[in-house]
Design a protein with these regions (language model features):
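Hydrophobic transmembrane alpha-helical segments that form the core helix bundle
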Residues: 1-62, 66, 126-135
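Histidine-centered catalytic micro-motifs
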Residues: 37-44, 68-84
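Non-catalytic, topology-defining segments of multipass membrane proteins
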Residues: 1-20, 86-135
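Residue-level signal for short amphipathic helical patches enriched in basic/charged
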Residues: 31, 84-87
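Short, exposed beta-strand "edge-strand" segments with a Pro/Gly-rich flavor and a Y/T-containing core
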Residues: 55-60, 78-82, 100-107
Length: 135
């Protein structure tokens, strides 16, 4: 709290938004982005299964969102190979994409699948999104 108050005072003193933009506001817009992106990773999918392709989703983001999210949109790949650095996840995806379910295109593509599934799960808690996984 003291840091935020000090930042607000510094912004008023220097008549600049920069201290707020770099210290206080990232907490708000950063958490919002993490929530929006994070929900795409597992919502509506199976739980407690050993094959991460059934419990995790990869979503192709635009370059800005991908950078902000450390390329963690390749989430199946991250779960299957957790020691691969985030900057190598796109390369890993290219190597194994023929063994993966289809990647969702953007947040819209992910939420188009997630929202109906969550509605179905509110009525049937055992419902899980069926995935087409290559053999």
């Amino acid at each position: 709290v003291f840091v935020w108050v000090g930042t607000i005072i510094a912004s008023l003193y220097f008549q600049s938004w920069l201290p707020l933009l770099f210290i206080v506001l990232p907490n708000f817009y950063g958490k919002t982005l993490v929530t929006i992106f994070g929900a795409t990773q597992h919502a509506g999918l199976k739980e407690d299964v050993k094959d991460h392709r059934h419990s995790t989703r990869s979503v192709l983001l635009n370059p800005v969102f991908s950078f902000l999210y450390w390329q963690m949109e390749y989430h199946i790949e991250h779960h299957m190979f957790p020691t691969v650095p985030s900057y190598n996840l796109p390369k890993l995806h290219e190597m194994i994409k023929d063994q993966m379910p289809p990647i969702r295109k953007g947040l819209y593509g992910a939420y188009k699948e997630i929202i109906p599934a969550l509605i179905k799960q509110s009525k049937d808690p055992h419902y899980k999104i069926p995935l087409a996984i290559p053999a």
